[in-house]
Amino acid sequence: MKKRIDYLSNKQNKYSIRRFTVGTTSVIVGATILFGIGNHQAQASEQSNDTTQSSKNNASADSEKNNMIETPQLNTTANDTSDISANTNSANVDSTTKPMSTQTSNTTTTEPASTNETPQPTAIKNQATAAKMQDQTVPQEANSQVDNKTTNDANSIATNSELKNSQTLDLPQSSPQTISNAQGTSKPSVRTRAVRSLAVAEPVVNAADAKGTNVNDKVTASNFKLEKTTFDPNQSGNTFMAANFTVTDKVKSGDYFTAKLPDSLTGNGDVDYSNSNNTMPIADIKSTNGDVVAKATYDILTKTYTFVFTDYVNNKENINGQFSLPLFTDRAKAPKSGTYDANINIADEMFNNKITYNYSSPIAGIDKPNGANISSQIIGVDTASGQNTYKQTVFVNPKQRVLGNTWVYIKGYQDKIEESSGKVSATDTKLRIFEVNDTSKLSDSYYADPNDSNLKEVTDQFKNRIYYEHPNVASIKFGDITKTYVVLVEGHYDNTGKNLKTQVIQENVDPVTNRDYSIFGWNNENVVRYGGGSADGDSAVNPKDPTPGPPVDPEPSPDPEPEPTPDPEPSPDPEPEPSPDPDPDSDSDSDSGSDSDSGSDSDSESDSDSDSDSDSDSDSDSESDSDSESDSESDSDSDSDSDSDSDSDSDSDSDSDSDSDSDSDSDSDSDSDSDSDSDSDSDSDSDSDSDSDSDSDSDSDSDSDSDSDSDSDSDSDSDSDSDSDSDSDSDSDSDSDSDSDSDSDSDSDSDSDSDSDSDSDSDSDSDSDSDSDSDSDSDSDSDSDSDSDSDSDSDSDSDSDSDSRVTPPNNEQKAPSNPKGEVNHSNKVSKQHKTDALPETGDKSENTNATLFGAMMALLGSLLLFRKRKQDHKEKA
């Protein structure tokens, strides 16, 4: 018979196309990954460059909108200078020519408690005539009032040229105005920053000595509250912490309990206690009768409050009290605007809080290319040791502009010398000048560490450029500059009891034209706040002669702020457990020699989706020309590891020239790498055009080395690209040399549409020894679309022993082994057969023996005939 040579080539072409497709897909996926990652790397680089460029631009930009809250960056530099909020009041003056005498006025709010004023823009009227820039002028205060009220009074900044021909520059703070310049055409705007200030008070109490026992375990704190959690420390902003405490056991004089602040807070603010053993006194805690219950101190270095009980507690029980203490920013540990942890420990009990610092930007000045820009802050005042010192930080040209003939004036007063306790002179003042490498790294808190690598000290370059020619004024000639400078001032104040007021002024011109004169000033005045508390207790009770103690003064307890409920952490999704790969060593000698010479529509829809030992020995004993429609629909959901021991003695004598277009589209996706070395040398011209296009893309590497020497020359080019890794070593040497040369021209159209959708990982090593040498031109379109995607080698060995019609006796029907305890459908079939069998009318033993003998003879003859035909075929080949 003719062989289909083109079939193999077609399959090879398909395989080549598939390999090419896979290769193309790999190239596309690889390119996508490669270019995708590269693109992200480029974006990251661009973002980094953008960030760097943005920082540089921000450092040199003229905009003053530098209000972004940054991530806290704690500075670990050892600097014990404590903080107290200092109030700044700035005014700037801008004109096109340098006047002989200039005065500017500001408004400053003064208040002893807790009000903050908002900076408001002001303006200048300048009617000065032109003067030479070389004439050094000293900006000087004209008049100023500080009223310790919540109202605004006018301050003024004065500029003198040899203290002659002074002119007044009105700076009303209520509304913005413009500059009137008689000789210039430009009208730049002027802005002032108003801040309240408070006078420095004297210490309240002396430090208490803790000589007793720490009784934190006997003290319980409650009703803790922060007055506010957001403020501007550069505008004298601060907060208060309030708490109640209860002594749960007896204590004696000298015993103490403690409270500790976090790094982001201080209890001393900008008051410097470094010359006082780093200890700050706190107001006494007193009873309602005025008796001192406890004395308190604050350690600057450890940030610890110590409350020492007096002898008042010796005969008392049920001691209850409360305290309220001011808290300030730590400029060194919280240098940038942002939110910080503020967890406070009271008597070993932690109260967790967050606090946000919105520092006013230190980058301020005139809004034009050559506008003067300067700011300053008093960051430490010694009020306790008697040395009367203070520390001040000045940022010169923080906008990093190109300026010409720049002068900076540091003054110990604002309006009038007699209204300030500040002293600026060559003997009272020490100046250190630093050049800033990166302006963007300047702190928002005005803290500057002299050992910071971002600061380069250049004090020696200014030895001959610092002058004290005018009373209480230090004049520094910077000249032409393009960089930012930091000036650290260590000064003194006197004992007159006046407020410490300072002022810094910068003036410069356009370095190109040597004109366009600009001036900007900044005022400072520090604030001190004090706290205190109260307590009471009951006298010890004597059962015989009770002595009542003073009544307890109940204090209204502040409502504690509710603590936020933490969001529950999402539980991780459980990872799916991988399903074990079936061991598809299915030696399923699926000798599907289904010489279905009958019209047995054996629609064996064996959805062998699982491990069913589908030994469906459905002996559909239909006589070959007997259209025994044995619809053996063995829906054997054979969920088994398909130990398909199908003893299919397919003794089909039927010369089934089965042109069986067994388009078994068995999409056996059973990843079965069916390397079926099926040496199908069966020269059986079984021209069974069984286009078994079993494109079973069984991509499972199941090395199903099914050496099924199924010597069937059935051009079953099952190009099953079964790349299945499922090492299904089904060595089913199904050498079924079943020379089934059954010439029974049983043209049985056995449409055995066995749609056995065996959808499991079927290592369908269907070693179908389809030795169908049967010339049975039975167009049995067995379109067995057995999508055997399963492990079920559903060997529906329908032993269609045609011509036999042998019904085996019930007691001889062998039940297949079922190691998994699953339902054996063949048993059910046997029982049904037993029930429906015809009554026996003859001798059972004789019929049985005759049938067995005939079957054996037929089998022997078939084997001999098939072998002879195979040998003949080999000889012809």
From Swiss-Prot:
Compartments it resides in: Secreted, Cell wall
Primary location class: secreted
Gene3D superfamilies recorded: 2.60.40.1280, 2.60.40.1290
Region (Disordered): 44-192, 530-849
S-S bonds: none
One annotated Gene Ontology cellular component of this protein: extracellular region
InterPro entries referenced in this protein's UniProt entry, alphabetically: Adhesin_Fg-bd_dom_2 (IPR011266), Adhesion_dom_sf (IPR008966), Fibrogen-bd_dom1 (IPR011252), LPXTG_anchor (IPR019931), SDr-like (IPR050972), SDR_Ig (IPR041171), YSIRK_signal_dom (IPR005877)
UniProt PTM comment: Proteolytically cleaved by aureolysin (aur). This cleavage leads to the inactivation of ClfB.
Region annotated Ligand binding A region, chain positions: 45-542
Secreted keyword on record: yes
Biased composition (Basic and acidic residues): 833-846
Function: Cell surface-associated protein implicated in virulence by promoting bacterial attachment to both alpha- and beta-chains of human fibrinogen and inducing the formation of bacterial clumps. Partly responsible for mediating bacterial attachment to the highly keratinized squamous epithelial cells from the nasal cavity via an interaction with cytokeratin K10 (K10). Also promotes bacterial attachment to cultured keratinocytes, possibly through an interaction with cytokeratin K10. Binds mouse cytokeratin K10. Activates human platelet aggregation.
Protein name, UniProt field: Clumping factor B
Natural source organism: Staphylococcus aureus (strain NCTC 8325 / PS 47)
